[in-house]
């Protein structure tokens, strides 16, 4: 098949029946405004034209989903990552987990995130419970996301489930990095930790990315600490502020050396 033919087939992924209801996992036609799951009756919410295919915890505020303009735009096809370049060039179906405000456009690329950082996302989805069928994708990549997942081992299993036999995965995640990001920073990964997460995959290769100097790490810590103190000072009285600054300073000092 010609490359254009492959791309055309990949571009029609919305009509291939790979989307699943986030509540009951039944086959879900690509949802539009007013769509409902024929099996459980779940109404599919649309946020700025993007379908919300994730479940919610009791009391979770839906307005937290809309984070448009809170992240700078980037284009993952211009980062010089060989895996990403080869996956996009293959014409096969590619899933990006935690796409954020990725400006990359490809007919074979399905971009998801738990929050609406961009209206260019295919859908909002929880990486711990992906709304896709088994064996749906040929390639999966995730850039600077795994440190923000509360159960990365569950996400690794979800990737394994939705990946076709012979498929491939690329995960770029933090090792020596201070607390950062929205809404949470849970884990930094060692080589052995990453291997353990993906120990049910046939082949796992771990490599180190460019080293971040101590000066850069320190600058990041100082900048974050300033923003933390500024936010607390604006939100509380002077007496309360003094108490909270001491606590934040202690916590941040512990994070910096642990």
What does each model-identified segment do?
Residues 85-86, 161-164:
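Glycosyltransferases and closely related glycan-assembly transferases
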Residues 149-150, 163-165:
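Helix-to-beta-strand junctions that scaffold the AdoMet/dcAdoMet cofactor pocket
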Residues 144-148:
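Short catalytic micro-motifs in class I SAM-dependent methyltransferases
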Residues 126, 160-161:
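Residues in and immediately flanking transmembrane alpha helices
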Residues 153-154, 158, 168-258:
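S-adenosyl-L-methionine-dependent methyltransferase catalytic module, highlighting the catalytic core
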Residues 2-130, 135, 139-143, 153:
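Conserved N-terminal segment of class I S-adenosyl-L-methionine
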Residues 30, 90, 165, 200-203:
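Short, well-ordered coil loops that connect the C-terminus of an alpha-helix to the N-terminus
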Residues 139-140, 162, 197:
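Conserved short hydrophobic interaction patches
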